């Protein structure tokens, strides 16, 4: 593990950019960027277009390591190059800590939750991530209803994978998303917090994780988790809120920082001039940085 990157992730001021839309969500991400499905005829062309979009983001002067601590990549992005370097190396050289999304998507809903699908090639993927100088990983589950067994299952599965990831020298981001429209969102979050605390308490001193959570209904609910000795940082997802709304809610939560995807890229368009693009990205970065660093 890179100690300098660990120090940056633990104490740095800023947020994490989530650039990890994968196969399923790529057409939607491209459409929002202004690239329609009739502009590519197969997956290779689609992934090239999305890589071009991400390259435009990470090479922009607005994508500044003074405000962006890390970036989460999709597996394809890790294996591609930006300006002649593997994406992870490009980011690290720029001062941005690279993470890799390792999950294979969500299973069908059961007990009010969606567990992760099996990750059969996890070992190989992690070995490649280490080779590509990736610092950590991210994997997402989804909680839709107040069901204690379901929530317990989500957390257990996350920690089971997390331990394998830690064993390879990487820092896992555990992401049990709570759907922002869930009927009992506040109660779900209380149960989730208790289960996460159990999982964290069972780790050895040297087993470090990060958490990526939905912004809680009750402000500062996750402060205890952020202060846990095994937690490097707690980051939050935008989860379907607009950027302004997500930023407003984030400001009420001390110690939590953003890890936004759609809320970061929502004003970016393929048709923008470089100047317009840099300004739109810069405005988004500034507002998300402000919500991550300057609290109410």
Curated annotation (Swiss-Prot):
The active site is at residues 175, 212. Pathway: Carbohydrate degradation; glycolysis; D-glyceraldehyde 3-phosphate and glycerone phosphate from D-glucose: step 4/4. Keywords: Glycolysis, Lyase, Schiff base. Gene3D superfamilies: Aldolase class I (3.20.20.70). GO terms for molecular function: fructose-bisphosphate aldolase activity. It comes from the Bacteria. Its EC number is 4.1.2.13. GO terms for biological process: glycolytic process. It is an enzyme of class 4 (lyase). SUPFAM superfamilies: Aldolase (SSF51569). It catalyses: beta-D-fructose 1,6-bisphosphate = D-glyceraldehyde 3-phosphate + dihydroxyacetone phosphate. Belongs to the class I fructose-bisphosphate aldolase family. This is Fructose-bisphosphate aldolase class 1. It comes from Staphylococcus haemolyticus (strain JCSC1435).
């Amino acid at each position: 593990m890179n100690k300098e990157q660990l120090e940056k992730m633990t104490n740095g001021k800023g947020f994490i950019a989530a650039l990890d839309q994968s196969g399923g969500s790529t057409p939607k991400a491209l459409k929002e960027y202004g690239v329609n499905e009739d502009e590519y005829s197969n997956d290779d062309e689609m992934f090239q277009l999305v890589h071009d979009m991400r390259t435009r983001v990470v090479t922009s002067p607005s994508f500044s390591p003074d405000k962006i601590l890390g970036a989460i990549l999709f597996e394809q992005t890790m294996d591609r190059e930006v300006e002649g370097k593997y994406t992870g190396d490009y980011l690290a050289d720029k001062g941005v800590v690279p993470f890799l999304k390792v999950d294979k998507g969500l299973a069908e809903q059961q007990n009010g939750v969606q567990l992760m699908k099996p990750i059969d090639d996890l070992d190989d993927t992690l070995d490649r991530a280490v080779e590509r100088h990736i610092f950590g990983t991210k994997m997402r589950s989804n909680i839709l209803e107040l069901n204690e067994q379901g929530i317990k299952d989500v957390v257990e599965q996350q920690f089971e994978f997390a331990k394998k990831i830690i064993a390879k020298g990487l820092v896992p981001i555990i992401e049990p998303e709570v759907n922002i429209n869930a009927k009992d969102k506040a109660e779900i979050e209380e149960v989730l917090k208790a289960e996460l605390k159990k999982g964290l308490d069972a780790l050895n001193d040297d087993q470090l994780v990060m958490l990526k959570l939905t912004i809680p209904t009750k402000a500062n609910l996750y402060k205890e988790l952020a202060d846990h000795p095994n937690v490097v940082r707690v980051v939050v997802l935008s989860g379907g809120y607009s950027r302004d709304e997500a930023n407003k809610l984030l400001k009420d939560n001390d110690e939590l920082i953003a890890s936004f995807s759609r809320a970061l890229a929502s004003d970016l368009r393929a048709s923008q001039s470089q100047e317009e693009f840099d300004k739109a990205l810069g405005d988004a970065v500034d507002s998300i940085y402000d919500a991550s660093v300057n609290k109410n």
